[in-house]
Amino acid sequence: MNALEITQKLISYPTITPKECGIFEYIKSLFPSFEVLECEKNGVKNLFLYRVFNPPKEHAEKKHAKEKVKPLHFCFAGHIDVVPAGNHWQSDPFKPTIKEGFLYGRGAQDMKGGVGAFLSASLKCNPKTPFMLSILLTSDEEGPGVFGTNLMLEKLKEKDLLPNMVIVAEPTCEKILGDSIKIGRRGSINGKLVLKGVQGHVAYPKKCQNPIDTLASILPLISGINLDDGDEYFDPSKLVITNLHAGLGANNVTPGSVEIVFNARHSLKTTKESLKEYLEKVLKDLSYTLELEPSSSPFITASHSKLISVLKENILKTCHTTPLLNTKGGTSDARFFSAYGIEVVEFGVINDRIHAIDERVSLKELELLEKVFLGVLEGLSKK
């Protein structure tokens, strides 16, 4: 089967987070020679398929210790869950439709197209040297993600099955297939700052202490401020205010406090501690409370790594373009792999219609992406 045929089948399952809808049974049926590991918690299902090709023999000096030499373990990872389709589609979002060179359906780009491409490439994998190939899929990436990839990786660590390298087939490209590889992601810190004042009647300002006035004086130092200068792969870390709230709704009462909710997307140069230190300097001598809660950590895979080199080589060969290495965008499951010291990158189709009405992927993209992924498998298994 090719990438198009598999992707069509995947789209036909209405796997809105965290529903799995039997899609894993279909995927397992494609790989009868692979070992299967599954885990389920709180309605979230995860699937891990793996196979060791040409298992290496024990080194003579290690025979007594019964230690086997481990082959390179490469993993394709992704999610089969999708966001709700909404209304006003030109066709049924869960009935894959081909029109004018595009495949339409919810998840076509995010990310059943990428999954279909790597499943098809994996079916064609036939290395001549010792090589371990695995596939990790979850039904909860678009949701909280607590019991998805993160949980499965805990199980894999327990069983000594963690991969060495991973490609997460998220839709990373902007205009043409091959123009972008995500080699890392920024971290995310959620914050809440409450500036305290003294509530009172607006007619007696000397008896009040309006925290909004206080906020106005420090706002230029916190709203949209760059926390560092970034680097070659990371944009400058930035603090962005997402919500402000003050007052009782009455026009003759000054508020007793003002609440500022914010988020900081940050590089490796900024941490929770450095952000706290900066805000404490800005807020010196003011009455306030501050809460900071990291929701994800920044990470990056070295641009000279074997995985990135092989991927770039096959993108150039297949797509005739040199990809930009970057860390733009929101968080993804790639961060969970990085936490275990695993080389991980993200590469997939164009992302111009993710989560949108009439989501679609071009048939040519699926064909080329499968070739890139197969080339990566061949390249890694030879090295």
From Swiss-Prot:
UniProt: Zn(2+) 1 binding residues: 79, 110, 170
UniProt xrefs under PROSITE patterns: ARGE_DAPE_CPG2_2
Key word Hydrolase present: yes
EC top class, as a word: hydrolase
Q: Which Gene3D superfamilies match?
A: Zn peptidases
Tell me which cofactor or cofactors this protein depends on. Answer: Zn(2+); Co(2+)
Q: What reaction gets catalysed by this protein?
A: N-succinyl-(2S,6S)-2,6-diaminopimelate + H2O = (2S,6S)-2,6-diaminopimelate + succinate
Tree of life domain: Bacteria
Pfam families from the xrefs? M20_dimer, Peptidase_M20
Q: Which UniProt keywords apply?
A: Amino-acid biosynthesis, Cobalt, Diaminopimelate biosynthesis, Hydrolase, Lysine biosynthesis, Metal-binding, Zinc
Q: Where is the signal peptide?
A: none
Write out the catalytic residues in the record. Answer: 81, 141
Q: Does the keyword Hydrolase apply?
A: yes
Named in its record, the pathway it takes part in is:
Amino-acid biosynthesis; L-lysine biosynthesis via DAP pathway; LL-2,6-diaminopimelate from (S)-tetrahydrodipicolinate (succinylase route): step 3/3
Could you mention a single GO BP entry for this protein? lysine biosynthetic process via diaminopimelate
Q: How is the cofactor bound?
A: Binds 2 Zn(2+) or Co(2+) ions per subunit.
- Please tell me where Zn(2+) 2 binds in this chain: 110, 142, 355
Do you know which HAMAP family this protein is assigned to?
A: DapE
Q: Could you say which protein family the record assigns here?
A: Belongs to the peptidase M20A family. DapE subfamily.
Q: What does this protein do?
A: Catalyzes the hydrolysis of N-succinyl-L,L-diaminopimelic acid (SDAP), forming succinate and LL-2,6-diaminopimelate (DAP), an intermediate involved in the bacterial biosynthesis of lysine and meso-diaminopimelic acid, an essential component of bacterial cell walls.
Its assembly, as annotated, is: Homodimer.
Name assigned to this protein: Succinyl-diaminopimelate desuccinylase
* Species assigned in the record: Helicobacter acinonychis (strain Sheeba)
Q: Which gene encodes it?
A: dapE
